[in-house]
């Protein structure tokens, strides 16, 4: 670290006896411009040669019905080699056991990294942690309300709050019907803040033959919002005469 400008007159220090305690200060400090240029060049080269960061998505599963959507989303993202960071709420885990044959630890194995919903110190709770978006699937009305007012009581709502403040993409797969005016106002407020509200409404033009077909279409449309192409369902090509 340079203590003085490029070339410093240090007569004052010689007369005060400071060099008795700091002998190195008795030398004239000279910094070569070529040295600074070389050091800056090394730093730029190091930054430019850093490996590119993989596509990274934060996924949260809350306690609304439709947990199969979250599971299928994780499966597809893994197939596409997308890095995933997963948080499952207490009631998300309970709903998972009730609606599917999956156990939370099996679903966690689909993700690149998982976190406890209580661990608000996890990396995804910080704006300095870079990611390409967050998906809450399914998103309960409780989670929707908490995110809308910035009530960050757990890691899911904190990570969502950070995504909003950092202007990163946040998509909520809201699962409830019918919707009250409170639900709709919460959705409208978040939509105005740039959040994507994604009710998993199935498309029947695909002629779904099973629950799996319905999941494929919804998951594919979710990923469309993040610029991730998943060839999981037939896309609309206009009405064709038979």
UniProtKB/Swiss-Prot annotation:
Among the GO molecular function terms of this UniProt record, one is: flavin prenyltransferase activity
Q: Which UniProt keywords apply?
A: Flavoprotein, FMN, Mitochondrion, Prenyltransferase, RNA-binding, Transferase, Transit peptide
A GO cellular component term found in this entry reads: mitochondrion
Transit peptide, from-to: 1-58
Record Gene3D superfamilies = Flavin prenyltransferase-like (3.40.50.1950)
Q: Example GO biological process term? A: cinnamic acid catabolic process
User: Do you know which Pfam families this protein is assigned to?
Assistant: Flavoprotein
Sites where the protein binds FMN:
63-65, 89, 140-143, 175
Which residues are dimethylallyl phosphate-binding?
Answer: 205, 221
Superkingdom of source: Eukaryota
Q: What is its EC number?
A: 2.5.1.129
Concerning SUPFAM superfamilies, the annotation shows: Homo-oligomeric flavin-containing Cys decarboxylases, HFCD (SSF52507)
Where is the protein situated, by its record's location annotation?
Mitochondrion
The reactions it catalyses are: dimethylallyl phosphate + FMNH2 = prenylated FMNH2 + phosphate
Per the record, the major location class is mitochondrion
Q: How is it used?
A: The activity of wine yeasts to decarboxylate phenylacrylic acids is one of their biological properties related to the production of phenolic off-flavors (POF) in winemaking.
Extract the PANTHER family matched here.
Answer: FLAVIN PRENYLTRANSFERASE (PTHR43374), FLAVIN PRENYLTRANSFERASE PAD1, MITOCHONDRIAL (PTHR43374:SF1)
What does the UniProt record say this protein does? Answer: Flavin prenyltransferase that catalyzes the synthesis of the prenylated FMN cofactor (prenyl-FMN) for the ferulic acid decarboxylase FDC1/ubiD. The prenyltransferase is metal-independent and links a dimethylallyl moiety from dimethylallyl monophosphate (DMAP) to the flavin N5 and C6 atoms of FMN. Involved in the decarboxylation of phenylacrylic acids like ferulic acid, p-coumaric acid or cinnamic acid, producing the corresponding vinyl derivatives which play the role of aroma metabolites.
Similarity section? Belongs to the UbiX/PAD1 family.
Q: How the protein assembles, per its UniProt entry?
A: Oligomer.
Other noteworthy facts: Present with 1750 molecules/cell in log phase SD medium.
NCBIfam families reported for this sequence: PRK06029.1, ubiX_pad
Q: What is this protein called?
A: Flavin prenyltransferase PAD1, mitochondrial
Species lineage, top-down?
Eukaryota, Fungi, Dikarya, Ascomycota, Saccharomycotina
